[in-house]
Amino acid sequence: MNLRRLLLGLLPLIAISFAEHSYGEDLTAEFDAKHKKCLERIAEDNELAFEEAMIWQDDGGGRRAKHCVAMALYALGHEDEAAHRLDALAKASDGGTPAMRADFYSEAANFWLVANKPDRAYKSATDGLDIKVDHLDLRIARARAYAMSGYYEYAEIDLTSVLGFDPKHAGALRYRADARLQQGRLSEAKADIENSLKSDPNAVETALLRGQINEAIRKQK
């Protein structure tokens, strides 16, 4: 699945996660509801969502408004600016709890990856992991940044760490299979890709990667 479409499809879940981490006197149910509505608006009309989010931000919408602005920018195709704003939000005085800041860094890292800027993705992911070392999405994002830069051994280390927390994580297994394929370790890549498909049998990208691994094994014989 295209990463952009996948991330946009997760907007409602992001809104729920944002609300679950909301603490403090200024984090009202009304603001949570407005943030959720703002994210949902992106799927309907991303230009209008951006305009409304900017107005809300100027009216004192705080981190929720800033977050929605960034997500709308991403939907409009401005991955760099969206990632930059999320990095800034994670560092800001109104960035929220450590868990929320880590989530902002995770979104930023994934947006940098879409923008094909692995160095920036690595920085965002590492900054997030400094806050929350067991954040699996951050560790996967950093592994993907390593792989995009050709550092497959380092990518494998991060992915193995993810699998230490969640041995059946389909995404981590798939990415590690690819890292091992790139290193020519075909039997290990084959084992990972089969386990990934067991965890998520309908994953098209995983099935395609299995085909590549099987072809590499065939050519090696």
Please report, for each region that a protein language model flagged, where it lies by residue.
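N-terminal leader/linker segments that initiate helical-solenoid repeat arrays
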Residues: F18-C68, D80, H84
